[in-house]
Swiss-Prot record:
Organism, as annotated: Ovis aries
N6-methyllysine: residues carrying this PTM: K557
Residues in Albumin domain copies: 19-209, 210-402, 403-600
Gene Ontology CC: one annotated term: blood microparticle
Sites bearing Phosphothreonine, chain numbering: T107, T443, T445, T569
Gene Ontology terms for molecular function: enterobactin binding; lipid binding; metal ion binding
Subunit structure: Interacts with FCGRT; this interaction regulates ALB homeostasis. Interacts with TASOR. In plasma, occurs in a covalently-linked complex with chromophore-bound alpha-1-microglobulin; this interaction does not prevent fatty acid binding to ALB.
Listed name of the protein: Albumin
Residue positions binding Cu cation: H27
């Protein structure tokens, strides 16, 4: 990259980076401005999401009261922006409403202490009390009951969905949740007319649930990236992702969008849901206004209403890679001015490297592209301090190859394991692997994470080679972030803490490299995990699997160096025991009689 060209790029980037694409007009009343922009229904939905994400234990009706109060106040401010309190910040208005809740101390304990603080510390305090794993009842869809509720009051049904999802997922991307709530109501509009409501509803609800959980995990990773590694981490991720999706867009267009996309996510992660949704709509408009310069795939998205438009843009397929792109080596390895360009503006130069690499490689995972950029940066830091920098960095692309080979080999190996054993067997192999790596982690967390990791086989292994790596690596990033979020709340393993905090892009390789934790002191054998009753016979298959996998984790915590053969023997005995007693006439009597024998045979097998 010649010096004159690079300076032009730097000036363009600096301008785009500072300007972004949003109008940033000031308004006398922020709440009136957002109410006017968003409309009453979206305003109410977003306020309900915000309160539900902060006050996760409050009943729905209490939240509805808070939403009504704030909506009426917003309408007052729309009518007269100079009305008392209309000039207050949204944080102040929301915080004041939260602090009015009579049962705040009783229900949330020291969260009530937040109310003694001033903004912005008060909002930060509320954010810190969000619970990623709240103790809430499992939702079980009953088609007839749900259809009756839907027909009785569609608006309330929509609100109840927002409330139930938001309080279970306190970082859910709010404008996306509005989109899913509308889709959810649409499913009931269709299926409640059907003769067999359950046959129509349940598969659609299950499919939507998977999408909603994936959306929640993606946003939780974005928020964790900002919280733990700063905006730069999310910007780098977004540059790689958008460069893959919009490979014909130029670097300055990509960085403009990245700057404001980061602002949108930062707002939502920070609880500023009204600003987040409003800015996201503006960003979607900008992208559609400039679609010809960005991607041929956007047209279908841009004809949709605002919530569907934003969702469609986020999910849009990658555009075709432009033909005749020059080789990467020309600007980033062969050019003798690389160090000059890098030292003049490191982030711009590395950003352009990431952009150029990503747009040429839609088949790579974002996390892999970020590892390539990180190692390229480390190489330049080393080489640019030497007497002959060019001789040092000229072969850098050969040195980067291992970062692509490592995940490809790992995926091949794990997909072979999945194809041999199926999803449940693959999950069990991962339970053994991860319990040995981090036996201090709680049993429910190890089971949850291993089951989720095991689903990567079903999700990704059947995909074509060009899609396997992004599917696998990016999915694993979400699951490992969940482990890190849960572990941060109650840290028990130094190894897990190290992998979670040292490097966002190297989390997966760090966990892959962990071995048996030799510092762990095995726990005593606990009979309760091998004591069962007749109720296990009527459990759904998934819950039966979880019972067995819980026992497997506990076995490993008792005997982390147990051989695969020992574990196989114990688990086969366990399955035979359950099958025998579930087939018996007196099931409970069988469990009482045979249970102690299972405990004895298990202890003998592990001796």
């Amino acid at each position: 990259m010649k010096w004159v060209t690079f300076i032009s790029l730097l000036l363009l980037f600096s301008s785009a980076y500072s300007r972004g694409v949003f109008r940033r007009d000031t308004h006398k009343s922020e709440i009136a401005h957002r109410f006017n922009d968003l409309g009453e229904e979206n305003f109410q939905g977003l306020v309900l999401i915000a309160f539900s994400q902060y006050l996760q234990q409050c009943p729905f009706d209490e939240h509805v009261k808070l939403v009504k109060e704030l909506t009426e106040f917003a309408k007052t401010c729309v009518a007269d922006e100079s009305h008392a309190g209309c000039d207050k910040s949204l944080h102040t208005l929301f915080g004041d409403e939260l602090c009015k809740v009579a049962t705040l101390r009783e229900t949330y304990g020291d969260m009530a202490d937040c109310c003694e603080k001033q903004e912005p510390e008060r909002n930060e305090c509320f954010l810190n009390h969000k619970d990623d794993s709240p103790d809430l009842p499992k939702l079980k869809p009953e088609p007839d009951t749900l259809c009756a509720e839907f027909k009785a009051d569609e608006k309330k049904f929509w609100g109840k969905y927002l409330y139930e999802v938001a309080r279970r997922h306190p970082y859910f991307y709010a404008p996306e949740l509005l989109y899913y709530a509308n889709k959810y109501n649409g499913v009931f509009q269709e299926c409640c007319q059907a003769e067999d409501k359950g046959a129509c509803l349940l598969p659609k609800i299950d499919a939507m649930r998977e999408k909603v959980l994936a959306s929640s995990a993606r946003q939780r990773l974005r928020c964790a990236s900002i919280q733990k590694f700063g905006e730069r981490a999310l910007k780098a991720w977004s540059v790689a992702r958008l460069s893959q999706k919009f490979p014909k867009a130029d670097f300055t267009d990509v960085t403009k969008i990245v700057t404001d996309l980061t602002k949108v996510h930062k707002e939502c992660c920070h609880g500023d849901l009204l600003e987040c949704a409003d800015d996201r709509a503006d960003l979607a408009k900008y992208i559609c206004d400039h679609q010809d310069a960005l991607s041929s795939k956007l047209k279908e998205c841009c004809d949709k209403p605002v919530l569907e438009k934003s969702h469609c843009i986020a999910e849009v397929d990658k555009d075709a890679v432009p033909e005749n792109l020059p080789p990467l080596t020309a600007d980033f390895a062969e050019d003798k001015e690389v160090c000059k360009n890098y030292q003049e503006a490191k982030d711009v130069f590395l950003g352009s490297f990431l952009y150029e690499y990503s747009r040429r490689h839609p088949e790579y995972a974002v996390s892999v592209l970020l590892r390539l950029a990180k190692e390229y940066e480390a190489t330049l830091e080393d080489c640019c301090a030497k007497e002959d920098p060019h001789a040092c960095y000229a072969t850098v692309f050969d040195k980067l190859k291992h970062l692509v080979d490592e995940p490809q080999n790992l995926i091949k190996k794990n997909c072979e394991l999945f194809e041999k054993h199926g999803e449940y067997g693959f999950q069990n192999a991962l339970i053994v692997r991860y319990t040995r790596k981090a036996p201090q982690v709680s049993t429910p967390t190890l089971v949850e994470i291993s089951r989720s990791l095991g689903k990567v086989g079903t999700k990704c292994c059947a995909k074509p080679e060009s899609e396997r790596m992004p599917c696998t690596e990016d999915y694993l990033s979400l699951i490992l972030n969940r482990l890190c979020v849960l572990h941060e709340k109650t840290p028990v393993s130094e190894k897990v803490t190290k992998c979670c905090t040292e490097s966002l892009v190297n989390r997966r390789p760090c966990f892959s490299d962990l071995t048996l934790d030799e510092t762990y002191v095995p726990k005593p054998f606990d009979e309760k995990f091998f004591t069962f009753h007749a109720d296990i016979c009527t459990l759904p298959d998934t819950e039966k699997q979880i019972k067995k996998q819980t026992a497997l984790v506990e076995l490993l915590k008792h005997k982390p160096k147990a051989t695969d053969e020992q574990l196989k023997t114990v688990m086969e005995n366990f399955v035979a025991f359950v099958d025998k007693c579930c087939a018996a006439d007196d099931k409970e009597g069988c469990f009482v009689l045979e249970g102690p024998k299972l405990v004895a045979s298990t202890q003998a097998a592990l001796a």
